[in-house]
């Protein structure tokens, strides 16, 4: 998950407050109703992406470049079936496991320096509880036994050709 805030330097503290509130206190706001709403939102986003021209290409790439069981074999958003099956307790556990400062990167760019930012980051994120220690994902770089040629048919105005390679550091 990526969150971006584009704010003037004068709003840095407000942006840090908002992000620390999301990271540290969202769990209390998760309800059956809010989860149901978000499942609907994400399902619609998935359908919109799938129904765009060439929208199914990414799935074919992942499924054909990475073997079953590899963490990159499936698209991040999952399937509509996965989304429909998700329960409030699943969201809460995921939040507890992964939504913490020990599993996050905060990047500040622009007219700000470390001497200004560090005290504000400490102020707003200092009391946010760590999540569990997340073990590294086992994502070996697979080797295809032979070249693959996959042809997808879609109602699009132009042919598009994709050539994919799996390389170290990008897999």
Predicted regions and their residues:
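M16/insulysin-pitrilysin zinc metalloprotease superfamily fold
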Residues: 6-38
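Generic recognition of short, well-ordered alpha-helical segments
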Residues: 17, 119-120
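Non-catalytic beta-strand/loop surface segments
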Residues: 1-11, 36, 48-103, 127-171
């Amino acid at each position: 998950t990526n969150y971006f805030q584009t704010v003037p330097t004068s709003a840095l503290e407000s942006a840090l407050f908002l992000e620390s509130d999301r990271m540290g206190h969202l769990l209390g706001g998760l309800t059956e109703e809010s989860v149901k709403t978000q499942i609907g939102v994400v399902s619609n986003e998935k359908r919109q992406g799938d129904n765009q021209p060439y929208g199914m290409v990414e799935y074919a790439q992942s499924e054909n470049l990475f073997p079953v069981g590899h963490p990159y074999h499936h698209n991040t958003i999952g399937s509509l079936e996965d989304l429909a099956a998700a329960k409030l307790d699943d969201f809460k556990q995921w939040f507890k496991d992964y939504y913490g400062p020990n599993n996050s990167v905060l990047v500040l760019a622009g007219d700000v320096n470390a001497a200004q930012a560090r005290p504000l980051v400490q102020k707003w994120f200092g009391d946010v509880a760590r999540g569990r220690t997340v073990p590294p994902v086992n994502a070996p770089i697979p080797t295809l036994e032979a070249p693959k040629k996959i042809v997808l048919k879609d109602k699009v105005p132009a042919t598009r050709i994709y050539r994919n390679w799996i390389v170290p550091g990008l897999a």
